[in-house]
């Protein structure tokens, strides 16, 4: 209600009607186009991102609140990227977000992309669309293509031993390939697919191929004396199978087939000389002793 105040000036009665001055309240408003935010002075935000009650919002050139994906550029391009604003509230989203069935990680610098370390765990996000990727991801490396594997459920990068689709792999920054030493054990991984291989594996040596054997169960490289499929072999400390005539650490001589690598017993002819690899002495060449061989 208006309040009347009376003053007597020079014998004339003057009545002043005092009306309270109204002040516009800062608040949200909506019309058939969208939402905007008015300030106390009647103006409103336009073409800028602002903090309102601890939450970030973005307004277009008309002053309407933006929702969904928005590409922002800050500091003359030093910081730029994709940001996401809630389709209902308009507030900028941060952290892990599930959007249209895909996972994203949103930081103050926008949606992460490529290989990322988040709270000590490694993930990979599409370099264009920024959605989290799972499964096998390749990257160029120093000696060819390197492969990483990201868990189909959590998206976390695999490390250490992992069984994937029934095959074993070992990850150390990426899936290992070729001949590898893990701890005090030797293993071999496919040079292309990176899966662990077992059985006989060869590599070029001097003067010819070198052969190694990896246990079918554990995948570990074997060393020392081994019986494989009923035949006897011997491997050095590095896992390489002996071939030809060898003098071993026990001071005895043995003969291993140069092709099959198996220990040969019985009569052996080398450079025109005949030797007897005694099967009763582990295949060692007989020396300085009398034997009855074939009844003779």
Describe the function of each predicted region.
Residues 2-296:
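Extracellular adhesion/carbohydrate-binding repeat motifs centered on closely spaced tryptophans
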